């Protein structure tokens, strides 16, 4: 049976005898929606699921307050509210379990949340004014949490500034989550350090996000920083953080270990026994930097990086046909061999047109074909941003909205493909009929718009798609685009160090911050200052002491896995492993459809040697542009 009027509220409203004008107005936007989010009603496991829960649906994590308000107001013919007797409203009875509720108890009768919703119903379930009640800024205190030992705790305070200038402490309603719970465990707004390491707290409130870094250092006494040689700015920035965290870096690896490591990383091949003996016997103080130059200039370097870019760009005859895949591979290979500036390489793909055989860069569009997957691929590969979550709803962990998803996709909406004159040839053009990008919710036409401000030579969003693509290409590769250079150096860094400064490398977002922001900024600036030169970037990383560190750990860095204080053991890729076995045994593998003496790294397509050794050890099928498609775990897949 429902209670008609709890004593607490009776005293609040009857004894106070407040008039409607004296009672502060409670609105859905400012007061009620945060409660639904905090209590989990809009979570993916509850009513925020794609199809809702038990016949009732809300937007995921409350990204669409208008939809949620209308669902509450009009679903069940408005039977969720009883204005004559608010306490008998289903919206209060279910979460307090006065009637059966699959979600269990969400809050108690008489609690602060109960009182807010009660007042909202009594005042007429007002939506509120977005021009006044929307959150404009979220602030978190402290700015950083630094704990001297596991077991220490800290309290997080969250305040919101609304569109009308009003401010409120929203600590109780804000959602605070840790990206590494076994380092920083969160209970409501309290965080406790549980082990040595680093974590980031993501604070969410009404579509706004803030992050808070948490560091728990080693409490062990006796630490004394021992300076090691610093080859360049990479070492200075890495050491600055390590010293602060009481982590002593490992010394450099020996010559044989360095030769093996850099040979695999730059050309994907092990050194021969003769090369090992010669390098170890060499007494030159500059032999390591000279070796890097030699490897970068080798044909094997071109093969190795052609393979990597072929994976990312999904070069496969499944999508492109045999000739298309060959032509695209040769274009990638020529770009690597010429050391084409990376921004030029990307612009050539984005601005390609005409025959997929005459302009092989046009094959980039033949993989995804449609505007939405094309946009998703360009942002993930070239910016490290995953927009796919925003196709159906606002991104739950980032600022990207569903509107922005379709505005970005509109840059490619008129791109079309038609058959060419040769077998398998397609012509890329920019005048597809009915090319308007429409929002799935209401059908309105979405005009192209950048997700972030950056430079390009035009003004506004061009009306013709050829110009749209030009605008997009210039914006994406602009020197002041905050993601382009950073995502590139971060990806390349991961190839050499085993993990990115931001990891995963293609998931850059506020809730996945860099482990060393100063290092990432410096690498990006250096890359831009040297005109997006990939070889220069690799040379800079390879010559650093950080890259050349030993895998052997000490008592101060044995638990470090994020700050590059020592090298991380890495498994050889499928192609590297096969070529290594060929070198060790003297038995050259034979690939169907490939010339004799073809190495595994020279195989042009994932369909060559399909379901054999390479696939067993993790070769990607090039079905996705995600780095995660290549398996590098130690367990073999069962067949």
Language model segments and positions:
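Hydrophobic h-region of N-terminal signal peptides that target proteins for export
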Residues: 11-20
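Solvent-exposed helix-loop boundary motif
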Residues: 19-114, 132-159, 168-231, 260-261, ...
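Helix-loop elements that line ligand-binding/catalytic pockets
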Residues: 600-603, 623, 627-636
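Bacterial N-terminal signal peptides that target proteins for export
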Residues: 1-9
